[in-house]
Each structure stands twice: as C-alpha cells, then as structure tokens.
C-alpha cells in the first residue's frame, strides 16, 4: 500500500476541520490509508450575505468540488445538509458517515429553556427552516437572521446582543460547545434539515470505481438510506437547503424505515406535515426503498400544497 497520504479537501472552519479530521482518523484506522487535510476557503465562508439571499444551495461545497475536479484533492468532506440534491458531473457521493445526533439545540442566556424565554426575546438563527418551525411553536419571540461560525453565534448570546441562538447539536458537539446547550428540540417539535448530523464524502467518479474504492469503509448504509429519503423530499419539492423544509428518517425496526417531513411557512402560519413508513425488504435494497418512500411522501405533500409554501418562501427570501 502507498505511504503517500490521500489529500482530503475541507473548509477551514474549526467545525469543518474537526469533522474532516475525524473522518480521516476512521478511514485510516479501517484501511491503513494515511490522510492529510487540505484547507479550502468556500464562498459561503467569506461572503457576509445571508444565506437566503444567496439561494442557500452549494455555497459551502462548490470550492471543494472545484478542487476535486482540478485534481487538487482526492476526496472532500462536507456537512451533508449543505450538499445540493442535484448531481454534479464527474463527482460521486462515495460515503455517508454514521449520523450523529440530528436534533437542533438552543443556547440561551441564564440557562433558559425554550418554553421559558420571555415574550419578545431575540433568537438568532440563519435557517428559514428553524425560523418557520420555531415561530409555529412560539410566535411571540423575535427571530433574527445571523451568520458566522458557532463561536461567533454563541458570542452574541454571551455579549447580550441576543437572548438565544439555535444551532445543530451535532455541530456544537464537534466544536466542543455542548456546555452552552440549554435545551434540545425533539424531532417531534422541530424536524431537522435533511441530512443533518451526517457527513458526506465525495470523490471523482472515475476514482471511485478504482483507486478510491476504499472510501466505502466509512459508509454507513442505514444512515445513507435515511438521508436519501430526506433528500428526495427536497429534490421533489425543488427546494434548496435554505428552504423551510424539515425531514427526518429512521429505522423503527430492522426492515422498517419511517420518514417524517414538514414544510412550514416562514412566519409559522401554514404547515404541511406528513409521515410514512416503508418495508425495506420489499425493494432490491435499502436506498431504493428510501428513494421510493421520499417520492411518495413528497407527492402526498405536494397534493396538500407544500410546493406552494416553498415557492412563497423563495419569493420572500428576506423574511427570515
């Protein structure tokens, strides 16, 4: 086996490098392949514009994909929730890592729970999905769009600029800030972003059929099946990762995959929620079962007007 390290492309943030380093460690432990990190700056890292103004799709992954196609790195690691659903020519999703906790977390001043925040309290989040679902629960709070890494956002609470922020629990875990969490939203309260908590490993298609086949060593099939169902919802609704769409799939038995999804108006006033379960053994494999499940649930939601809520949210991008 070659001792030349495989080059792993990653964004420069603490969260990105921590999660990429973890993937590298697992890959090396399972395959013996040494890995070195190559730090890459994405457009999403340098722009000060709010993600809803940018469309929210691909702003954190395009630079990594460019580096892949240019041969500057062998593979790249992304937060799966940032990955566009449309395929990119020449690039393949080689692996989906085992999912971390997919839930959203509240980090509030004075240790406050979400239910205990006073009316009018300011809650920072960069996600229309979170704003929509939180507003449905607590329309009396003021939701403020914010940008920046986890440390920057948490600093706005510490400084008193905001009463609370909402972030992904998995992300807080990856940067060692779980002590800041004051409340955690169960998926029955706030459905996470499709793919939240999982990491995506991409490489060039031509390499995956040959020298980089070893990347399958970090692929976790149950997670891949679950996030496939979730991402099909996004694709069928023609919604980007900045849309107010939540989805979560999980195996409720060895052969039963359940998918829950919600599309909520950005002010929380309208919502289409749906749930469906599929028996995986009725299909050739789990990913095909997940794809069929996602398509059926998306079709049911579109019949209830979910696509119109997505379109309305896109037309009023400045709302969140």
From Swiss-Prot:
Source organism's superkingdom? Answer: Bacteria
Give the GO terms filed under biological process for this record.
protoporphyrinogen IX biosynthetic process
EC number(s) from the headed UniProt entry: 2.5.1.61
Please provide one cellular component term from the Gene Ontology annotations of this protein: cytoplasm
Regions that span the bilayer: none
Instruction: List residues, modification S-(dipyrrolylmethanemethyl)cysteine.
Output: 241
| Cofactor(s) the protein needs | dipyrromethane
Q: In which pathway does it act?
A: Porphyrin-containing compound metabolism; protoporphyrin-IX biosynthesis; coproporphyrinogen-III from 5-aminolevulinate: step 2/4
Keywords noted in UniProt? Porphyrin biosynthesis, Transferase
Reaction(s) catalysed (UniProt annotation): 4 porphobilinogen + H2O = hydroxymethylbilane + 4 NH4(+)
Note the Pfam families from the entry: Porphobil_deam, Porphobil_deamC
Q: What does this protein do?
A: Tetrapolymerization of the monopyrrole PBG into the hydroxymethylbilane pre-uroporphyrinogen in several discrete steps.
Additional remarks: The porphobilinogen subunits are added to the dipyrromethane group.
Subunit-structure text: Monomer.
Protein name, entry field: Porphobilinogen deaminase
Q: Which gene encodes it?
A: hemC
């Amino acid at each position: 086996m070659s001792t030349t390290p495989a080059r792993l492309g990653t964004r420069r943030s603490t969260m990105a490098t921590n999660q990429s380093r973890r993937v590298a460690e697992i890959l090396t432990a399972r395959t013996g392949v040494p890995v070195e990190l190559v730090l890459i700056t994405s457009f999403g890292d340098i722009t000060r514009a709010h993600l809803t103004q940018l469309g929210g799709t691909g702003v954190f992954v395009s630079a990594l994909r460019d580096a892949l196609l240019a041969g500057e790195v062998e593979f790249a690691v992304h937060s799966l929730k940032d990955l566009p659903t449309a395929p990119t020519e020449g690039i393949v999703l080689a692996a989906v890592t085992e999912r971390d906790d997919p839930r959203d977390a509240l980090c509030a001043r004075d240790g406050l729970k979400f239910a205990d925040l006073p009316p009018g309290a300011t809650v920072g989040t960069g996600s229309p999905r979170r704003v929509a679902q939180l507003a449905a629960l607590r329309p009396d709070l003021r939701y403020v769009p914010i940008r920046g890494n986890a440390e920057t956002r948490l600093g706005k609470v510490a400084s008193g600029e905001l009463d609370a922020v909402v972030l992904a629990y998995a992300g807080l875990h990856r940067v060692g800030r779980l002590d800041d969490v004051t409340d955690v939203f169960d998926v029955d309260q706030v459905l996470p972003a499709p793919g939240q908590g999982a990491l995506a490993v991409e490489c060039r298609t031509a390499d995956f059929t040959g020298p980089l086949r070893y990347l399958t060593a970090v692929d976790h099939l149950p997670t891949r099946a679950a996030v496939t169902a979730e991402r099909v919802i996004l694709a069928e609704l023609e919604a980007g990762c900045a849309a107010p769409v939540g989805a979560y799939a999980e195996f409720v038995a060895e052969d039963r995959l359940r998918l829950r999804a919600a599309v909520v108006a950005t002010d929380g006033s309208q919502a289409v929620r749906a749930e469906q379960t599929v028996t995986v053994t009725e299909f050739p494999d789990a990913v095909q079962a997940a794809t069929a499940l996602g398509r059926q649930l998306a079709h049911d939601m579109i019949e209830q007007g979910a696509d119109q809520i997505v379109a309305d949210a896109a037309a009023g991008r400045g709302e969140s």
